[in-house]
């Protein structure tokens, strides 16, 4: 005669199935959390899309945008596995991560050309010097320097409107360090956004607009924007593969990074994502219109992760004028 299980057995069995089901759900929902720079976002997002396809839904990768500074805040609190960064980690961020017990591997993933753009109807500022940019953006200019002819007497007597990243942005940090001479030192009366697409639309719809952001956003929107050649003291230079690689686009050429939480990298989904990132970086970086690094850099990045070589080769502040070969030398000697 068939013997039915008693209620106690049924309760235990149900509990076991719930646990097994929950375990399966956890496995099915393996998650890699990334946040940070809007500049680095297109690269990491492209990697994430291809990785998720390759994993056939076994891993979800979320890529948020809160600016490099905002991204490091989350990263150092242990809220994310990876941070996208358009500048090296700052001293205060190092201290925050250390206090929270968060160790990280620094990985340069590309070079970027921070691009100064104007509206296509602007036919006067085809080139601009670093000094002119400083006169336009420095804190002392707020409410006082508001017209083009105050920057250059040959330019029209019309009010300009400025567009730039917000104060949590690594791009903002780098630009102000390179142009004004001090990170975060800027006039405050400009349209700010962590979303570069907002800046693109602002300049594209304003004849007197001027803004700055990463090269990829310019290339993606070059039909409605015009890049301005920047004169850093050796003549005006436009951003391009050639001028970034030969180091002539200065001072607005810079390395960009991801930082990986070393504890997170113990999880298979995070380790596999980073491996996929480094193996496919050269192709995907170029696809989204950034400047890829030599293959050896990506190999070195993985070697550092595998050997748990944590920390940074930078000194805790934005550095201006770095060339590709200098970044390679530092990372290789870590």
Model-based region annotation:
Residues 3, 21-24, 309:
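Short, flexible coil/linker elements and helix-boundary hinge sites characteristic
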Residues 11-24:
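Bacterial N-terminal signal peptides
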């Amino acid at each position: 005669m068939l013997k039915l299980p008693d209620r106690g057995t049924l309760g235990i069995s149900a509990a076991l199935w719930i646990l097994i089901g929950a375990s399966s759900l956890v496995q099915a929902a393996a998650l890699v959390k990334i946040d940070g720079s809007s500049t680095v976002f297109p690269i990491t997002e492209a990697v994430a899309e291809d990785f998720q396809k390759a994993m056939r839904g076994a891993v979800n990768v979320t890529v948020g945008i809160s600016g490099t500074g905002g991204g490091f805040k989350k990263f150092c609190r242990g809220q994310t596995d990876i941070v996208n960064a358009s500048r090296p980690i700052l001293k205060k961020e190092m201290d925050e991560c250390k206090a929270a017990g968060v160790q990280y591997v620094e990985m340069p993933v590309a070079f970027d050309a921070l691009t100064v753009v104007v509206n296509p109807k602007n036919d006067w500022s085809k080139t601009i010097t670093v000094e002119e940019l400083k006169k336009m953006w420095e804190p002392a200019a707020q409410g006082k320097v508001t017209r083009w002819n105050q920057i250059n007497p040959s330019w029209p007597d019309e009010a300009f409107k400025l567009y730039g990243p917000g104060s949590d942005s690594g791009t903002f940090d780098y630009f102000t360090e390179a142009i004004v001479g001090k990170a975060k030192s800027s006039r405050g009366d400009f349209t700010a956004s962590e979303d570069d697409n907002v800046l693109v639309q602002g300049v594209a719809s304003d004849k007197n607009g001027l803004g700055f952001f990463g090269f990829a956003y310019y290339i993606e929107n070059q039909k409605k924007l015009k890049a301005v050649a920047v004169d850093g003291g050796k003549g005006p230079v436009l951003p391009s593969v050639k001028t970034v690689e030969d180091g002539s686009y200065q001072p607005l050429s810079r390395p960009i990074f991801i930082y990986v939480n070393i504890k997170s990298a113990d999880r298979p989904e995070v380790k596999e994502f980073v491996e996929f990132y480094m193996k496919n970086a050269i192709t995907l970086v170029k696809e989204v219109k950034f400047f890829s690094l030599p293959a050896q850099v990506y190999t070195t990045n993985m070697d550092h992760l595998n050997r748990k070589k944590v920390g940074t080769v930078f000194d805790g502040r934005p550095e201006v004028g770095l060339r590709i070969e200098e970044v390679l030398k530092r990372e290789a000697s870590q």
